[in-house]
Amino acid sequence: MADYHPNATYVEAMSAILMQFIVPTAGEDDLIDVCVNQLVETYLFDGLKENEAARIVNAQLELHRSGLSADDRSNWLRTKVDILPSELKERTFAMLAHRVYFASEGRLDGEAADILDRAAKLLGLSSPRSEKIIEVCEVLTCPIA
């Protein structure tokens, strides 16, 4: 039996939330591989062992791509959000915002803005707080020249 890291519950919740917004439910295997690898690398930084991080991310991916109804998916996601303390809700939003900005080459179009708005609401972040996080992500993805 694998060792259970104390952060694993938070990692499961963060993965579920991030996947909801950045991973398509079907197809686009290259994009999915990139997202999964990024999440695993992030959780290694948090102190999880690689096999534990990969197991969590893959389990969340499998559930994300399952045939859950919209209501079941919403309830499942809400339970994940409720697990997270406020600082991890902010971190999850920052990870998503950085990914959205990076994927859109530092531009925030209507679709990207909608994703971030829905994520901020789901995570219960105030408008000023989510806007500040978005500003930081904008600076981080801005070209030097």
Residue ranges and their predicted role:
Residues 1-145:
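Small-residue-enriched hydrophobic alpha-helices in membranes
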